[in-house]
Amino acid sequence: ATELGIYVLPMPFTMEGQEFYEDISLTQAQFYEKLEGETEIATSQPSPEAVTSLWDKVLKDYDEIVHIPMSSGLSGSCQTAMLLAEDYDGRVKVVNNQRISVTQRQSALDAKALAEAGKTAAEIEQILMDTKMDSDIYIMVDTLKYLKKGGRVTPAAAAIGEILRIKPVLQIHGEKLDAFAKARNIKAAKTLMVNAVKKNIQENLGEIPAADAKNAPWIAMAHTQNE
């Protein structure tokens, strides 16, 4: 990412009283190994010092920064960044366009392309904000264990769901993470998600000519454990 002029601020998490950073002090394989071993994991956000330290470093080589944090509905890091940016005289634009995971990555790539096209940080911020409601994420979880840990489902509902082998499908649209549907197996859950994506494309874009690559929808799939 750095080679592209994109800088990544790692998100910290705590396990067994120790603070770690993904792919810096702990690999993804080690993370999932500990997760499956019932290790208690708590997520956090970068410290204000970590944020401003990165900004100060980048501003030595660039005039402006477009900072794209995790969605404000899912992390307090967005509000923190907005407050910190007030001390940078407009040189740092914090874009709260409600992105996470693959959509956040795409926003970073879009911002880079816009910068290369000559857009200012303020113009990039406006373009990204104008399209903040134009994405949906659908998530299928194989177990209710972690939703129960996070308080998103009650222990009783999780127990019933496990017995019935229910595979919940969640949706992120804007800042909200909501229940979308329930399936009785992985295949049915995948079908639900594919149909939901098709419906989104049809409702938002209609029929797109095969030759119209410019307006083609962007679709990505992500898997846990790098599968």
Language model features with spans:
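N-terminal glycine-rich anion-binding loop in soluble enzyme alpha/beta folds
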Residues: A1-A50
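Short alpha-helical interface patches
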Residues: A29-G37, S53-W55, I186-A196
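A short glycine/small-residue-enriched secondary-structure motif
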Residues: T27-F31, W55, K60, M82-D87
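Mixed-charge interfacial surface used for oligomerization/domain docking
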Residues: A1-Q18, E64, G73-K93, R99-L109, ...
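Glycine-rich phosphate- or other oxyanion-binding loops that anchor nucleotides, phosphorylated ligands
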Residues: G37-S72, Q79-T80, E125
